[in-house]
């Protein structure tokens, strides 16, 4: 019993990074797709949400491994280990993905502010810059203390809990007579292959769930706890963590991530679809509803309170996702380019780049333009995901990167795959301990299969959309 308590106490120290990552999987960009799925196919497409989260867990675990073993996040590994031109190309795609993601957060927050506080969309868009100030105050990932990092994680966690509570309340407001039908929705169904619209919505759920910026985020936010361990044990922090720090953190980081994604991201996305399936099924106006229309539908078919709860959930998720996206923007810029700009400048630039197009659209096109820009952002993200995720699989399958050479507890391995060991490195020492964290062959094949599947399905979805198919992102 005591050993279980010790495990739980140690696990509690790792709670935080998984919650931050889960935010990327429950942003306002997911809502319209899930509502459309519930309205047209009731609970049948819950399986699509479940399998999308399985894919997300696989990719995010690779991120945890990469950041923990190498001491560098995905963007930094690209800079160290890829040709300069390829690195810059990947940076451009990553930056576009950050901006496209941020558009969805800005839109969701602005609409929520309009519903809750009657703030015009234009002012709502401008107010979204405030979440940058939160990051500026609390998040210092390269500092030598976990206190500010934990405060930041706690703050985002409050917003996540708020989102979850809102959807719990929504679930209590709907009636689900046939519980078996609901749980059956988490099992595979052939309707996805029989009806093209079901396939489109399933692909839309997949595209809206697995987000490019979460890969950079997930590989970076594991570093503070590694640094804290080495600082306390060895009195200094190296770029690459010690083997003992890796062993201390890796499995707990995996566990915290998996639990967070399933308890938070899967629950929220499923709850949206369940509420829609229970109340909006068979309603034609719900099949292609934007965020504001969803609010109006919930008010009409459930109650005004249900609509307000949805708006509050959208505000919490929009704010938390916006904070995380802005942080990911800093990770991308500093990792790929090693920017010398102060962190506040990087974060502010990332946020302003997303706000400017939203502001222009709201001023010129109003609510219709906001809906269009949200759809456009989801198309962009679907196309970019396979590009930015390919290096992740390459790095974690590369033995030159994932082998740790340990001597007296301190890692001294090449910083990049092209580095050459000299006579003083443990690579040539008969006494150095070698631990190989490279992906197994099965994991590599599985990762490549998932990558190819997501990439091909996303491309099919986007091409169908461009050809005029009725697709809901």
UniProtKB/Swiss-Prot annotation:
Signal peptide: none annotated. Glycans are attached at residue 87. The chain crosses the membrane at residues 14-34, 44-64, 97-117, 119-139, 152-172, 198-218, 257-277, 297-317, 352-372, 373-393, 448-468. One of its GO terms (molecular function) is inorganic cation transmembrane transporter activity. Its main location: membrane. One of its GO terms (cellular component) is endoplasmic reticulum membrane. One of its GO terms (biological process) is iron ion transport. Keywords: Endoplasmic reticulum, Glycoprotein, Ion transport, Iron, Iron transport, Membrane, Metal-binding, Transmembrane, Transmembrane helix, Transport, Vacuole. It is found in: Vacuole membrane; Endoplasmic reticulum membrane. It is a multi-pass membrane protein. Belongs to the NRAMP family. HAMAP family: NRAMP. Has a role in controlling the cellular iron ion levels. Mobilizes vacuolar stores of iron in conditions of low iron levels. This is Iron transporter SMF3. It comes from Saccharomyces cerevisiae (strain ATCC 204508 / S288c). The gene is SMF3.
